[in-house]
A protein has these predicted regions:
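Structured binding/interaction patches within domain cores
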Residues: 19-175, 196
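Mature, well-folded catalytic/scaffold domains that follow N-terminal targeting or propeptide regions
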Residues: 172-198
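N-terminal amphipathic/basic-hydrophobic helices that include classical n-h-c signal peptides
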Residues: 1-26
């Protein structure tokens, strides 16, 4: 089983802090040793460009599904929605990876200004956009979207809302990447706040 590095803000597992934030305060959940299944063939891995694009599109769908939670709090801030749009534009070959990554940074900046569901939804959009740079960020978009759904749920319905969001996400998975993503969820579930227990 791969070893993972985790840098969550406020993240804890069994009472133990999991790590630290990156310089900008955003969570980074990536394998210490990169999984070759999430590295494109041209960079020495096994990921086809077509599957890389599908991962990005799925991540964008996950983020867009909860984006209203951000927009209801910050209706005049377009950065997270633009990140999702840039993700889709990258998948169509209309923009460069660097442009998508810049959109991710803008969405993450929007997230840092907030808390709760709105913050998680904006981070989901940022994670989706950075899939263009590192395919393994696909789980970041999904995990943050689930966290947003949990945070937005009333009372003690958060766990149930998270499971429903997780199931919805899995229904959106294209067949070509389904097993890859489900296996990634199994491997990284614990460091992703165990949100993929659905």
């Amino acid at each position: 089983m791969p070893v993972y590095r985790v840098f969550p803000h406020g993240g804890r597992l069994n009472g133990t802090a999991l790590g630290r934030c990156n310089k900008k305060g955003a969570t980074v959940i990536l394998p210490k040793d990169r999984d070759p299944r999430f590295i494109t063939i041209r960079r020495g891995g096994t990921l086809a460009d077509s599957d890389h694009r599908l991962l990005a599109l799925w991540a964008a769908a996950c983020a867009e599904h909860v984006l209203h939670l951000f927009e209801s709090v910050q209706p005049s801030d377009p950065r997270p929605r633009q990140a999702c749009e840039q993700t889709r534009a990258w998948a169509r070959g209309e923009i460069t990876m660097s442009q998508a990554r810049a959109a991710a940074g803008a969405a993450n900046a929007a997230a840092r200004e907030l808390s709760g569901a709105a913050r998680h939804a904006a981070y989901a959009a940022g994670q989706a956009a950075v899939v263009a740079h590192v395919a393994a960020h696909e789980l970041g978009a999904a995990a943050y979207a689930i966290k947003a759904a949990r945070a937005a749920a009333p009372g003690c319905e958060g766990e149930s809302a998270g499971r429903l969001e997780c199931r919805w996400q899995r229904e959106q998975l294209p067949d070509a990447i389904r097993e890859l993503v489900l296996e990634d969820q199994r491997l990284r579930n614990e460091i992703c706040w165990s949100v993929f227990d659905c």
